[in-house]
Amino acid sequence: CHKGKLLYPFVLGSYVVFVNLRNLNNIMSKVFIRKSKESKPVVAICYDFDKTLSPDDMQAQGYIQSVGDEVESFWKESNGLAEENEMDQNLAYMFTMIRKAHGKVLFTKKALMDYGAKVQLFPGVETWFKRIRDYGVDKGVIVEHYIISSGLKEMIEGTKVANEFEKIYASSFYYDKDGVAQWPAQVINYTSKTQFLFRIEKGTLDVNDFGVNDYFKPEDIRIPFRNMVYIGDSDTDIPCMKLINSYSGHSIGVYNPETKDKRKVYKMMEDKRIKYYTPADYTEGSELDELVKTIINTTASNEKLMSIHYQNKQEQVSHNGQPDNLEEKEKEKLIMDLENSNSFKQTHSIISKLKKIKDWTLEEKKQLKTIAEKNTQICSIMKDGDVASFYSSLE
C-alpha cells in the first residue's frame, strides 16, 4: 500500500511497474483486440522515424521555425532543461514545445499533424511498405510494419505513410476538450522502446494490454524475435537492436545516402549492436531493398524447418503423455539407467525400481539380460539377493 492506495506490481519487458489496483481493474476489464498466430510466418519490420525514414528530426521541419526559434538553440534549451532537472530528455522536448508555442501558434493535434504532413522522407519510402508486403506475399510470408520512435505520434500520423503501419508507438500528448495539448500521454525513450517489441511478439498491441505478461509456448508466439527486423540510425535504437540480436533477429543501421556519413553505423557494428548497415535508400533494387528481401527469403525457409520441429515436438509430447505410454517410458528410462550404471550403489537402486514393474516384453527381457552380461559391474553382483531375485523373475 502507498498512501492508502493498493498498488499492484507487474512486469513489463525488463521493468516492474506498480499500478493503482482500482485503475488496474478498469484496464483489465477492457476487452483488447489481439493479433492471433497465423498459419503463415510473419515478419515484423520495426522502424525508428527521425533520420531512419526521414532525413531530419520532425520538430526541425516546420514546428521550430513556426515559433521563431533556431533548431540548434531549441535542442540546446530542451537538453539543458533535462540536465538541470534530472528530467527525461523526451519529456523535456515535449514540455519545451508546449511552452514555446504558447501565445504564438495553436498547439493542437491537428496542428501537429499538419507539421507532420511537411516532413520529408528518404528516397523510396512512400512506395516501400506496400512493395515489401507484396514481396512477402509472393514468398508465403506476411510482412508487417511498425514504428517505435521517441518522436511525436501526432506528427507521424500526419505523414503520407501513416496508414502503412500496423501500429505507431511514439510519444504523444493528452488534449483538452478544445483539442489543445496539455500533458504527455505517452513518452517513449531509448530503453522503454523495448517493451513494444514484446507487444509485437505476442500480438498484444494495445499499450494498456496486460496480456503482454502472459506466458506463451515458443510454438504459439505470433512473431518470434528471430522474425523481427529493426531499422534505426543511432544510440537511441541500441536497446532494441541488442534485444533482437540476442534472439537471432535482424538489426540494420542506416545512414544518410547524401552525406554518406558512416561513423555511427561503424560504431554500432564495432559494438555488435547491428548485423548490417546500408544507406537509408528505400528505392527498389537498393542495398536496403535487397537486404530485407533476403531476410524475408531466409524467414520463409527457416519457418518451414521450425514448423517441422514443432510438429515433431508435439507428437513426442503427446506420445509421452498417453497413460498407456507412461509405464513404457519409465521402463525405457530404467533400462538405459541400468546399462549406464557405474557403481554398485546405483545398480542396487535401479534394481529396486525395476522389481516394481511386473510386465516385461520378450524384447525388454532380452535387453536386461544382455546388459547383465556386458556390464561387468552388474555381472559381478549377480548373486546379490535383490539382483538375483529380479533376474530370476524374468525367466
Model feature map: region roles:
Residues 347-395:
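Extended alpha-helical scaffolding segments
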Residues 75, 90, 102-106, 140, ...:
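Residue-level signal for secondary-structure boundary elements
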Residues 29-177, 268:
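Alpha-helical substrate-recognition element adjacent to the catalytic core
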